[in-house]
Amino acid sequence: MFVNGTPVIEIVLSNPLLSVKFPESGSVLAVIDTGYEGFAVVPQDIFKKLRLDELSQHKRALTLPTERLIESTGSYARIIIPELKTFRDGFVETTDGVDEIVLGTEFLEGFKLVLDYCTRSFEISSCW
């Protein structure tokens, strides 16, 4: 689906090591961003709700479209796509100023995407 011209998908975030998920019920919208090469970036409050700050942390440098470098902190988590009954595990990071959940190209590996801006339709399916 599209929201204000941006492709989004319904997901559930999970920390399987500590049995925590976000949201606790239902799903949340995440932005698909093919310009972001990482797995996922989330707001700091969601990172804390998932208790990812209690796991081993890794720091990375992210390059913004303006070529400015910022530091992110992250850990490993699971992203579930209820519509496809599938999930992917990967590095979920956070940094100051993030106000939405963003899924990048590392997350999208193994999926087929069809974005049709003419009809504002979005299709996703697993390659496997």
UniProtKB/Swiss-Prot annotation:
Gene3D superfamilies (alphabetical): Acid Proteases
Top-level taxon in the UniProt lineage: Archaea
InterPro entries: Peptidase_asp_AF0612 (IPR022274), Peptidase_aspartic_dom_sf (IPR021109)
Name of protein: Uncharacterized protein AF_0612
Protein species of origin: Archaeoglobus fulgidus (strain ATCC 49558 / DSM 4304 / JCM 9628 / NBRC 100126 / VC-16)
